[in-house]
């Protein structure tokens, strides 16, 4: 049985063949998903998702709700707020 830290499903199990011919299980972190819009669920453009060592403020666009909602949703919300 693996030790308690490796029993979590947040780690991905990968079967690896060793040079000696045995098959062992390696535990890896799961791949991160693409940032998505909170309203529509579509992938966000403008997010620099390749650079994870920087914070969200560096990666996200510098507009209001940048990195949270898509530009189309934001434009629609601004139009709605102005017209009311």
From Swiss-Prot:
The protein's name in its UniProt record: Large ribosomal subunit protein eL34
Family: Belongs to the eukaryotic ribosomal protein eL34 family.
A GO cellular-component term linked to this record: ribonucleoprotein complex
Pfam families assigned to the protein according to its UniProt record, in alphabetical order: Ribosomal_L34e (PF01199)
Alphabetized InterPro entries for the sequence: Ribosomal_eL34, Ribosomal_eL34_C_sf, Ribosomal_eL34_CS, Ribosomal_L34e_arc-type
Gene3D superfamilies to which the protein is assigned, alphabetical: 6.20.340.10, 6.20.370.70
Segments passing through the bilayer: none
One GO term of the biological process aspect: translation
Cited NCBIfam families: PRK04059.1
Domain of life: Archaea
A GO molecular function held by the record: structural constituent of ribosome
Keywords attached to this entry: Ribonucleoprotein, Ribosomal protein
């Amino acid at each position: 049985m693996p030790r308690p830290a490796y029993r979590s499903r947040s780690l991905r199990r990968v079967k690896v063949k060793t040079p000696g011919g045995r098959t062992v299980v390696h535990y890896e972190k799961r791949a991160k998903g693409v940032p998505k819009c909170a309203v529509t669920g579509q992938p966000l453009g403008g997010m620099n998702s390749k650079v994870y060592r920087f914070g969200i403020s560096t990666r996200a666009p510098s507009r209001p709700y940048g990195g949270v909602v898509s530009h189309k949703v934001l434009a629609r919300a601004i139009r709605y707020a102005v017209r009311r």
